[in-house]
Amino acid sequence: MTERFTGRLADVIRRPLITEKATRALEQNQYTFEVDHRAAKPDIKAAVEQLFDVKVTGISTMNPPRRSRRIGRFAGKRAQVKKAVVRLAEGNSIQLFPES
């Protein structure tokens, strides 16, 4: 059994993922984040609602497999990540790109 995330809510979300697919999903009011791999959906929902002051209507999570990495003769694995696609209620939005 995996360990449960017990840290602060601010530590759940690591960073927003800005990819072509994630940028297209912004039109449907869906935001993609890299989150702590131990965080469950209720943890992610609470963190997003508290940090960004929005209403979350749904969350989809993905645990992609860890990829191997080799540097010279040393082999290892990349850090484990978890992706979360968060759907917001109508009228809510998160400003990922600050106006300059």
Curated annotation (Swiss-Prot):
It comes from the Bacteria. InterPro entries: Nucleotide-bd_a/b_plait_sf, Ribosomal_uL23-like, Ribosomal_uL23/eL15/eS24_sf, Ribosomal_uL23_CS. GO terms for molecular function: rRNA binding; structural constituent of ribosome. PROSITE patterns: RIBOSOMAL_L23. One of its GO terms (biological process) is translation. Disulfide bonds: none annotated. GO terms for cellular component: ribonucleoprotein complex; ribosome. Keywords: Ribonucleoprotein, Ribosomal protein, RNA-binding, rRNA-binding. Part of the 50S ribosomal subunit. Contacts protein L29, and trigger factor when it is bound to the ribosome. PANTHER family: 60S RIBOSOMAL PROTEIN L23A (PTHR11620). Belongs to the universal ribosomal protein uL23 family. One of the early assembly proteins it binds 23S rRNA. One of the proteins that surrounds the polypeptide exit tunnel on the outside of the ribosome. Forms the main docking site for trigger factor binding to the ribosome. This is Large ribosomal subunit protein uL23. It comes from Synechococcus sp. (strain CC9311).
